[in-house]
Amino acid sequence: MTPEELALRTDLIEACRSMNSLGINKGTSGNISVRYGDGFMISPTGIPYDKMTPEHVVAMGWDATYSGDVVPSSEWRFHRDILQARLDLNAVVHTHSTHATTLSILGRDIPAIHYLIASAGGSNIRCAPYEIFGSQDLADRVLVALEGRRACLLAHHGVITGHVSIARALSLAVTVEELAHQYLMCLPLGEPSILSDSQVADVLVKFQTYGQQIRSGHVGLRQAS
C-alpha cells in the first residue's frame, strides 16, 4: 500500500466517522467513495465506522472487480457510475440525514430558498424517483438527477453529494441537510419565496472567487474585491 493510497483510505474512514459525529448519519448506514488509480475506493458494507481500518476500505475497478474478503458497500453501483460519468467529481458521499431524507419521502426537490443552494451547482437540488437500494435502476436515476448538479435527494432513501475531494463532498452533505432543514421549517408557514435563476447564477459566478484562492507571484499589498 503506497503512502498516497493509505492517506486516501484514512481520509475516507475519518469522513465516515465524521458523518456520524456531525449528525448527518447514524450507525453503519451511508457510504463514501473516492477516485483512485484506474477505479475507486469505497467504504465496506456493514462494518461499524469506529472499527474500520484502512484494510477494510475496498478498491474497485470500473468493471466492479475487487480483491479480498471485504465486501464493498451495496451502493457501489451509483458510486462507480457517478465517478465514471462525472470527471469533475473525485469523491461521493451518501447519507441518510434526517431533514434531507424527510424531504425525499415527500418527493420534493429543494428549491432556491437560500443562496447556498448554488453550492450544489444550480438553482435546485432534485429528488430522484425511488428505486430499491443497490440497484442499477437507482444508479441510472441518480445520474439523471445529478445532471448539472453536485447533489441530489433519493426518494424514500437519503442524499448524495459529490465534489473534488472527500472533505468538500462531506461539507456539501452538511449544507444540503441544513438547506433541507430550513425548507421544512418554512413549509408550515406557507411556500417560501424562491431566488430566481438569474440570482442563483450570480451566486455561482461569485463562488468562483470565494474562499482562499491560490495566487502565485503576488507580493505586497493587494486591493480587496
Where are these regions (language model features)?
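Glycine-rich flexible loops
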Residues: 1-225
